[in-house]
Amino acid sequence: MTDRANEAVSHLFETFGEKIVETGYHGSIPLITLTPEHLPAVASHICHAPSLRGTLSLQWAVDLRPVIQRFQLFYLFSLAEDGSWLLLTTHLDGSARIYPSITPRVHAAKWYEREIRDLFGLIAQGHPDLRRLVRHEHWPRGTHPLKKEFAWNQVMGRQEGIYHYRRMEGEGVFEVPVGPIHAGIIEPGHFRFSVAGEPVRQLEIRHFWKHRGVEKLFENLTLTNGPALAEKVSGDASYSHSLCY
């Protein structure tokens, strides 16, 4: 742990005191455990306190069942100045599936919390936009592919549905759709521009057209067989994905 990270943990203890359940490490990264209701305040403080000025770099969930009846949430922050890492975590026990959203205070969490809802069925209460992100509208209701009970070879049905794009209206405003099919090896992506002449007034992006259960396939592979699958995740990132794996 760097001196900067050590100072950050001490600062959070001084500020939030008993709201912090415990501290530890995830590898060499400081790990602070909180109850769900205190997440928004602590996450916001990390991002906006002048002495910290952290950036939310990643947010993810883990389904620990059947070993423990628990879902665990992680929030990885990079601190200003030296880029030290700081990790927050909380958990939902038993049948709990709702946790407080940090998006209203930390806007970078917006897509992460939507993705977690789609893949795990965990709902970020207070999120301003819980439209589907990874699960496109044809996915059956209640289908969450990273829950432990979802089998890697499960055949899903298909339902009809419409994705409601955000609309911008006004004199001289036009929508310009681009994609999802593009030339070359670039992955599919739909970009919907709202323009008024040359200025772009709004852009809405839809990705995840090729979600195909890769995470579940990894669960069934040995460590040595994983790189071959990692290379196939994305056509324009085969080397970087296998290297990270």
Each PLM stretch: what is its role?
Residues 174, 178-245:
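Active-site- and interface-proximal helix/loop "cap" or "latch" segments in soluble metabolic
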